[in-house]
A protein has these predicted regions:
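Bacterial N-terminal signal peptides that target proteins for export
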Residues: 30-43
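Short, low-complexity, intrinsically disordered N-terminal modules
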Residues: 6-7, 11, 21
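Bacterial N-terminal signal peptides
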Residues: 41-52
Length: 301
């Protein structure tokens, strides 16, 4: 009984559908009606597109940007053997044709101020700064705060225990994270003696450098136990000031993991939840370069 009724219902539906097809095929549109229909269809498409744009959520709303970059000037700190930043005026003023014009030239070593170390810096045959993909320079960040220890010991080296303790308080460092280390030394910028341990210049000054860095064992743990995009910290080098072998650089760079150095304002970032955009000057074949690094931090609900 139920099967018979269902069959009749299907037949009736098919009959009505066929009738609608016949009705529509018999309609004849005048040229004027076709024009109006085309215009109406275009209007519907435009309205639909605008509605879609309005409904789409624009990126980076409901939060704030934090600039993690020290400005470049005559006060910018560099390695004792590196050429410092200089800005020279090429022209500044009114031109003979009556309009204002300004242009400068600058000189500096790649590695100074807020900058990036590309893997080629300590790993032969590895990526130069222009070869680093944008995806590797952007992403979610975790901030490991060792400022309490670094305040007591200028030669402090961040350990595997520090990383594991951070994970116990928060979560496992996610795959694809950018790992930032806050030592608190950014508060000394641009006082060279406090930030670097010496304000002297030249080869002899290198032995007098004192600032915190990442212990080679911690660098090795990061590349073997976690999958990260990049590292960064608020001192002049990933390795601590007294390093002579730069092992942490070598361990990270052998895996094509770049480093951000002399990062500012890490005290303004949460332990988790910040999104980093770190874009260096795209120097072909460069071992590093000036870096503009910013963080997006969403507002707490």
């Amino acid at each position: 009984m139920a099967i018979s009724m269902r069959g009749r219902a299907v037949e009736e539906a098919n009959r009505q559908h066929a009738a609608r097809i016949v009705f529509h095929t018999e309609i004849r549109y005048s040229p004027d009606m076709k024009t109006r229909f085309a215009r109406f269809s275009s209007l519907l498409f435009l309205l639909g597109s605008l509605t879609g744009l309005a409904a789409a959520n624009p990126p980076f709303t409901g939060g704030r940007w934090i600039d993690l970059t020290h400005e470049f000037s005559s006060e910018t700190l560099y390695w004792p053997t590196a050429e410092r930043f200089t800005l020279e005026t090429e022209f500044h003023g009114q031109t003979p044709k009556g309009y204002f014009y300004a242009a400068n030239r600058y000189r500096a070593s790649e590695h100074g101020g807020t900058h990036i170390d590309a893997p080629i810096h300590f790993a032969e045959g590895h990526k130069t700064v222009d070869q680093l993909p944008i995806d590797q320079l952007t992403g979610a960040a975790v901030v490991v705060d060792v400022s309490a220890r670094a305040q007591k010991d200028a030669d402090y080296q961040i350990t595997v225990a520090d990383l594991k303790a951070w994970e116990e308080r928060h979560l496992q460092i996610p795959n694809g994270a950018i790992v930032l280390f806050r030592t608190g030394f950014a508060r000394h910028w641009p006082d060279a003696k406090k930030y670097l341990g010496t304000d002297e210049k030249g080869t002899d000054a290198v032995a007098k450098l004192h600032f915190p860095g990442l212990h080679p064992d911690a660098a090795r743990w990061l590349v073997s136990e976690r999958t990260i995009k990049a590292v960064g910290l608020d001192t002049a080098s990933i390795d601590y000031g007294q390093s002579t072998l730069f092992e942490s650089h070598r361990i990270l760079f052998e895996k094509n993991i770049p480093a951000f150095e002399n990062v500012a304002a890490l005290d303004q970032l949460p332990a988790t939840g910040a999104y980093i955009i770190a874009l260096p000057m795209k120097i072909k074949g460069g071992s590093g370069g000036p870096l503009r690094i910013v963080a997006w931090v969403a507002e707490k609900p």
